[in-house]
């Protein structure tokens, strides 16, 4: 796979260092034997840098996974993909592995991972564990989940403000970008909770937060075009990496004054302000005596909350456009849920069972992906995330599972997501059935599994166990609020007759980001 990024000619000393390290890397690859794992589905002889393997993986990952799993006869063998050198295991092992401390989710997604997200490089610390701020981010998400009931109304205010400002009150049909609209809407609602009301509508802040993850993805692609041994050096010379660090500095200039005011309020003993992860995390870090970077922490909150959520929201919108017969039943459900005259209340969101079924069925067919660049064409470098393989781990020691399956120390592995097409679990699995999970609620055995936020081995979109996505509850609320406002206030339909093409890049499904819909204002039956 050719890189879309070009390395500018560096200073002579830097060039000499790079050339020397490159030669050492090539010699190491040629002279040091590699310990092969079984069933390297897309391994090619003399493919030193795995370029052919990456091409195979990019072109047909779904078929590679299916082919590999079909070869799993002996339980001690699992398929491996040369792209990144990791195992893909059937879902049946996920329950046993989910909380086993002999496997590390952190190392699988950071230092040891072939999908290296380069947390050790300046500007790249904000995703996943990070280096300085993880001790405040995860408790911050837990605190946010405890505040969900009080956060519904402020999030609803931001959804309403965004739609009125951007979709307007125009009663005539006009065009809106699905991707840009959903990202902007979710970004503003999330910012209200992350940095508070002072900054949540700031255009510069939104531009940074919406582009940071995309810029980071482009920078990662640029770095990974070079051998791993060069990563600690090469990032200093890449414009895309410098851009990431510039964005962090810009975000810091906006966040720091708010943080300083929050600290002054706290020092004076003023009454607590409305919840924000910015204020809560800072107080928590102070109380615990922990050092952290406030800007990187908030960038991580933002990266985690916007892109996956907005991607799924956009897919749900397009599925509803595909099935316009759903619009009126959904509206009736929303009116019934919010017909108390008290605006958006958290308990009302729990009544939206049809909406939740539509959300979960969409997620089953089109697992959420984190888009890192919007401009077309849609290419593998412009997407990140793992949609059809999930729950990555690395073995910290050699582990033998209960059925005799052995996972050697240092092995990186994830779990396939193929059972979402298992007809014994989901009748007619290839068909979009918006009522599927509503019917499941009526089955006493399966009722507890129908919830959108339920993490289970047969639906791995949110992972499983103690590393399951902690932000899924907030995502559930944001998507329901967004859909409620949109369905009540607007008519909408596809531009054209068919859904935009669903494409797969690596492990990720995504619609063409150029998808557009027509919208027009209508009179809502209830006020949120």
From Swiss-Prot:
Its main location: membrane. It is a single-pass membrane protein. Its cofactor is heme. Heme binds at residue 469. One of its GO terms (cellular component) is membrane. The chain crosses the membrane at residues 5-27. Disruption phenotype: Prevents the post-NRPS oxidative modification steps to form lentopeptins A and B, and leads to the accumulation of the N-acyldiketopiperazine intermediate produced by lenA. It comes from the Eukaryota. Nonribosomal peptide synthetase; part of the gene cluster that mediates the biosynthesis of the ergot alkaloids lentopeptins A and B. Within the pathway, lenC catalyzes the post-NRPS oxidative modification steps using as substrate the N-acyldiketopiperazine intermediate produced by the NRPS lenA. Lentopeptin A forms via a stereospecific hydroxylation, followed by a spontaneous bicyclic lactam core formation, while lentopeptin B is produced through an initial dehydrogenation, followed by a bicyclic lactam core formation and stereospecific hydration. Belongs to the cytochrome P450 family. This is Cytochrome P450 monooxygenase lenC. It comes from Aspergillus lentulus.
């Amino acid at each position: 796979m050719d890189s879309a990024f070009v390395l500018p000619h560096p200073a002579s000393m830097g060039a000499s260092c790079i050339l020397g390290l490159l030669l050492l890397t090539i010699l190491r690859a040629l002279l040091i034997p590699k310990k092969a794992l079984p069933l390297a589905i897309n391994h090619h002889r003399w493919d030193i840098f795995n370029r052919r393997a990456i091409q195979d993986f990019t072109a047909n990952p779904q078929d590679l996974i299916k082919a590999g799993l079909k070869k799993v006869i002996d339980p001690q063998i699992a398929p491996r993909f040369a792209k990144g050198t990791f195992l893909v295991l059937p879902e049946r092992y996920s329950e046993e592995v989910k909380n086993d401390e002999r496997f590390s989710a952190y190392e699988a997604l950071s230092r040891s991972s072939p999908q290296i997200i380069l947390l050790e490089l300046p500007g790249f610390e904000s995703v996943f564990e990070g280096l300085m701020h993880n001790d405040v981010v995860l408790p911050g998400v837990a605190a946010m989940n405890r505040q969900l009931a009080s956060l519904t109304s402020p999030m609803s205010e931001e959804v309403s403000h965004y739609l009125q400002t951007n979709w307007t009150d125009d009663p005539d049909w006009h065009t809106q970008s699905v991707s840009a609209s959903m990202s902007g809407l979710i970004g503003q609602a999330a910012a209200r909770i992350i940095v508070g009301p002072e900054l949540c509508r700031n255009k510069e802040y939104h531009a940074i937060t919406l582009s940071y993850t995309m810029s980071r993805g482009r920078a990662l692609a640029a770095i990974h075009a070079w051998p791993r041994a060069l990563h600690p050096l090469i990032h200093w010379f890449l414009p895309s990496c410098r851009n990431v660090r510039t964005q962090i500095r810009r975000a810091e200039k906006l966040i720091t004054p708010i943080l300083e005011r929050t600290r002054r309020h706290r020092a004076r003993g003023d009454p607590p302000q409305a919840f924000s992860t910015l204020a809560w995390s800072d107080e928590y870090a102070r109380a615990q005596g922990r050092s952290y970077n406030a800007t990187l922490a908030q960038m991580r909150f933002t990266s985690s909350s916007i892109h996956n959520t907005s991607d799924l929201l956009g897919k749900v919108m397009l599925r509803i456009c595909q099935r316009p017969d759903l619009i009126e039943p959904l509206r009736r459900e929303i009116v019934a849920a919010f017909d108390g005259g008290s605006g958006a209340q958290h308990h009302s969101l729990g009544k939206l069972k049809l909406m939740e079924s539509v959300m979960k069925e969409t997620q089953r067919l089109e697992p959420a992906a984190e888009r890192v660049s919007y401009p077309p064409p849609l290419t593998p470098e412009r997407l990140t995330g793992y949609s059809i393989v999930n729950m990555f781990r690395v073995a910290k020691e050699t582990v033998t599972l209960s059925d005799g399956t052995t996972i050697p120390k240092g092995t990186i592995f994830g779990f396939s997501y193929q059972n979402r097409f298992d007809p014994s679990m989901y009748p007619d699995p290839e068909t979009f059935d918006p009522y599927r999970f509503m019917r499941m609620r009526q089955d006493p055995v399966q009722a507890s599994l129908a919830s959108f936020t339920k993490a289970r081995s047969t639906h791995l979109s949110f992972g499983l166990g103690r590393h399951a996505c902690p932000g899924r509850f907030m995502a559930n609320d944001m998507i329901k609020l967004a859909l409620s406002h949109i369905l009540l206030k607007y008519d909408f339909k596809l531009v054209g007759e068919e859904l935009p093409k669903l494409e797969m890049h690596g492990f990720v499904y995504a619609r063409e980001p150029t998808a557009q819909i027509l919208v027009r204002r209508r009179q809502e039956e209830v006020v949120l």
